[in-house]
């Protein structure tokens, strides 16, 4: 699969450059070692403070702070000092994985796997003749905090929003072990991909990461 080769090259380069969320590297390696599937953009889950120039204007938004672990109240409060323009939100988002399957049968297996792992927003669609499965959970939080540099909530509200956002992040990340276990079972069923191990050697992945 030419597309898988390109996706793996992109992933391994990003790993070397420190641009991949560390707590899902093992899982990404596992998924990509499976024959007939590969990952594209994925995230281990995150929480942070973001400015959006207008509702839904994601391309022009600016993160004031973004972390892939529970955030501290003081971190959030300090980040708000850098707010300038737009609507200010605290956002908590669950892990998300985009996985491409080479055929409809594998896409269906991935869809069932995501749902069985507790990722209830898992869907799949056909894009440019590719079967793309989005493994996604339900724990999303968007809490408005202010506008145009003005924080319109008190510390009590901010602390509460941070607490709820962190709890949602922990809960969604807590499903990752089950997801990994189910992908291991899928690998036993579908087999491993020689291309993956070929590129592992080319990019010297074993020097820094243990293969699943």
Curated annotation (Swiss-Prot):
GO biological process: tRNA methylation; wybutosine biosynthetic process
SUPFAM superfamilies: SSo0622-like
Class of this enzyme: transferase
The keyword GTP-binding is annotated on this UniProt entry: no
Keyword annotations from UniProtKB, A to Z: Methyltransferase, S-adenosyl-L-methionine, Transferase, tRNA processing
A family per Pfam: TYW3
Keyword Methyltransferase: yes
This enzyme's EC code(s): 2.1.1.282
Molecular-function annotations in GO: tRNA methyltransferase activity
InterPro entries the record matches: Taw3, tRNA_yW-synthesising, tRNA_yW-synthesising-like_sf
UniProt catalytic activity: 4-demethyl-7-[(3S)-3-amino-3-carboxypropyl]wyosine(37) in tRNA(Phe) + S-adenosyl-L-methionine = 7-[(3S)-3-amino-3-carboxypropyl]wyosine(37) in tRNA(Phe) + S-adenosyl-L-homocysteine + H(+)
Bridged cysteine pairs (disulfide): none
Function, as annotated: S-adenosyl-L-methionine-dependent methyltransferase that acts as a component of the wyosine derivatives biosynthesis pathway.
Family: Belongs to the TYW3 family.
Name under which the protein is recorded: tRNA(Phe) 7-((3-amino-3-carboxypropyl)-4-demethylwyosine(37)-N(4))-methyltransferase 2
Organism: Thermococcus kodakarensis (strain ATCC BAA-918 / JCM 12380 / KOD1)
């Amino acid at each position: 699969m030419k597309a898988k080769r390109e996706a793996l090259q992109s992933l391994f380069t990003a790993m070397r450059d420190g641009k991949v969320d560390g707590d899902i590297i093992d899982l990404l390696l596992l998924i990509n070692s499976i024959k007939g599937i590969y990952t594209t953009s994925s995230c281990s889950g995150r929480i942070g403070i973001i400015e959006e120039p207008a509702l839904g204007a994601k391309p022009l938004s600016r993160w004031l702070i973004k972390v892939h672990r529970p955030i501290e109240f003081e971190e959030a409060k300090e980040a708000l000092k850098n707010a300038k323009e737009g609507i200010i939100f605290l956002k908590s988002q669950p892990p998300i994985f985009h996985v491409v399957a080479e055929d409809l049968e594998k896409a269906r297996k991935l869809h069932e796997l995501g749902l069985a792992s507790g990722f209830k927003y898992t869907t799949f669609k056909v894009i440019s003749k590719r079967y793309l499965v989005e493994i996604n959970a339900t724990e999303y939080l968007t809490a408005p905090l202010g506008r145009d540099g003005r924080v319109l909530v008190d510390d009590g509200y901010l602390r509460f929003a941070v607490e709820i956002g962190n709890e949602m992040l922990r809960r969604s990340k807590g499903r990752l072990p089950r997801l990994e276990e189910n992908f291991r079972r899928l690998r036993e069923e579908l087999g491993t991909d020689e291309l993956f191990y070929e590129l592992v050697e080319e990019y010297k992945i074993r020097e820094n990461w243990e293969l699943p």
